[in-house]
């Protein structure tokens, strides 16, 4: 190497290995708190090891991946990063419960232009809290510092979850039949969907995020973390004959409920069976959003829709409410003609 040339380092290129190591040290306690007995070893290896729980006779693995969309931009604008990790876990594990799966382990991907250890630690601490709520282990992840790919300290996150279900107990919608009852399980707010529309509404209405609505600021309503349904849903599944579960995410009622319905059936939803949480009425008014578009974009207060035999509905609602959920009968399954829409909201 020539003496008159500057010696370049990875840090000169914008990647701080020491910061990455500091983050790993900060989150070791978070990972430890999520540990399950099936997990072998700790973080830092090239791969993570996890045994299958011994209680399963014919275990099927169920996997899922998701992000939190442009809710991240809201978190960045508010400089509030401690709950976005809960959102990330929720979006993944709530998809697994649709098939009756118990989440086993979770991995995260955190990418940024310049690693802020404090912000990243807040995000991962939220991921750990989400894993605790879901009963799954945080067994690894990737932190990618990529200068030139992201603006400043902006970041993006993705989650990956694997769960397990007994083969004979998979919930796949094939048992859904006309006459089944539909149960709604309430959401905590918009969860992690529709935020591009939310941000557009905020822009065109020039809304004040510090405005109060039912005792909370608009900002607090919008950043409220996604509800994790795992523990209450698993208990419901254990005690009732669940025919289908739909996680109401992007696409709202119109897109998500048909995903779990067999041909020849439709969900008839009683729109008068619940009142939308105030934040949805506020969004509709501020954005002059059509009701059809609201149901197509947002969960409108419903996080899960569950199909089960009508005679079991009231008991299932009571169980869910005893577990701390807000559940109610929202409608029923009816026969559908060929080509008919599979969701009807009356």
Curated annotation (Swiss-Prot):
Q: In which pathway does it act?
A: Purine metabolism; IMP biosynthesis via de novo pathway; 5-amino-1-(5-phospho-D-ribosyl)imidazole from N(2)-formyl-N(1)-(5-phospho-D-ribosyl)glycinamide: step 2/2
The catalytic activity of this protein is classed by the Enzyme Commission as 6.3.3.1
Q: Which CDD domains match?
A: PurM
Q: Does the keyword ATP-binding apply?
A: yes
Q: Which GO CC annotations does the UniProt entry carry?
A: cytosol
Does the entry feature the keyword RNA-binding, yes or no?
A: no
Pfam families with a match to the protein in the record? AIRS, AIRS_C
Keywords attached to this entry: ATP-binding, Cytoplasm, Ligase, Nucleotide-binding, Purine biosynthesis
**Source organism superkingdom:** Bacteria
Q: Name one GO biological process term.
A: adenine biosynthetic process
Q: What class of enzyme is it?
A: ligase
Localization recorded for this chain is: Cytoplasm
Catalyzes what? 2-formamido-N(1)-(5-O-phospho-beta-D-ribosyl)acetamidine + ATP = 5-amino-1-(5-phospho-beta-D-ribosyl)imidazole + ADP + phosphate + H(+)
The terms under GO molecular function for this entry are: ATP binding; phosphoribosylamine-glycine ligase activity; phosphoribosylformylglycinamidine cyclo-ligase activity
What InterPro entries does the annotation carry? Answer: PurM-like_C_dom (IPR010918), PurM-like_C_sf (IPR036676), PurM-like_N (IPR016188), PurM-like_N_sf (IPR036921), PurM_cligase (IPR004733)
What family does the entry list? Belongs to the AIR synthase family.
Q: What PANTHER family does the database record attribute to this sequence?
A: TRIFUNCTIONAL PURINE BIOSYNTHETIC PROTEIN ADENOSINE-3, TRIFUNCTIONAL PURINE BIOSYNTHETIC PROTEIN ADENOSINE-3-RELATED
Listed HAMAP family: AIRS
Stated name of the protein: Phosphoribosylformylglycinamidine cyclo-ligase
Taxonomic source organism: Aliivibrio fischeri (strain ATCC 700601 / ES114) (Vibrio fischeri)
State the taxonomy lineage: Bacteria, Pseudomonadati, Pseudomonadota, Gammaproteobacteria, Vibrionales
């Amino acid at each position: 190497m020539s003496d008159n040339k500057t010696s370049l380092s990875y840090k000169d290129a914008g990647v701080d290995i020491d910061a990455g190591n500091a983050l790993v040290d900060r989150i070791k306690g978070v990972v430890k708190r999520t540990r399950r007995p099936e997990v072998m070893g700790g973080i830092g290896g090239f791969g993570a090891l996890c045994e299958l729980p011994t209680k399963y006779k014919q275990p099927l693995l169920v996997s899922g991946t998701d992000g939190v969309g442009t809710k991240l931009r809201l978190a960045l604008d508010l400089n509030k990063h401690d709950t976005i990790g809960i959102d990330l876990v929720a979006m993944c594990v709530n998809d697994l419960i649709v098939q009756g799966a118990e989440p086993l382990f979770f991995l995260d991907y955190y990418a940024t232009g310049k690693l802020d250890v404090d912000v990243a630690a807040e995000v991962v601490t939220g991921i750990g809290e989400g894993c605790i709520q879901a009963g799954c282990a945080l067994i690894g992840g990737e932190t990618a510092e990529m200068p030139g790919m992201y603006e400043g300290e902006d970041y993006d996150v993705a989650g990956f979850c694997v769960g397990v279900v007994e083969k004979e107990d998979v919930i796949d919608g094939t048992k859904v039949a006309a006459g089944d009852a539909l149960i709604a399980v309430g959401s905590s707010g918009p969860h992690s969907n529709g935020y591009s529309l939310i941000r557009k509404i905020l822009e065109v209405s020039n809304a004040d995020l510090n405005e109060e609505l039912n005792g909370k600021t608009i900002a607090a309503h919008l950043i409220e973390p996604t509800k994790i349904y795992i523990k209450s849903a698993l208990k419901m599944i254990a005690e009732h004959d669940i025919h289908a579960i739909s996680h109401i995410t992007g696409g709202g009622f119109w897109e998500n409920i048909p995903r779990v319905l067999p041909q020849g059936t439709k969900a008839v939803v009683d729109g008068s069976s619940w009142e939308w949480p105030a934040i949805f009425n506020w969004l509709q008014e501020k954005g002059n959003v059509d009701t059809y578009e609201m149901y197509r974009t947002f969960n409108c207060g419903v996080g899960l829709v569950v199909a089960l035999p009508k005679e079991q509905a009231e008991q299932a609602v009571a169980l869910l409410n005893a577990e701390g959920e807000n559940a109610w009968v929202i409608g029923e399954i009816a026969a559908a003609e060929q080509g008919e829409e599979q969701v009807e909201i009356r």
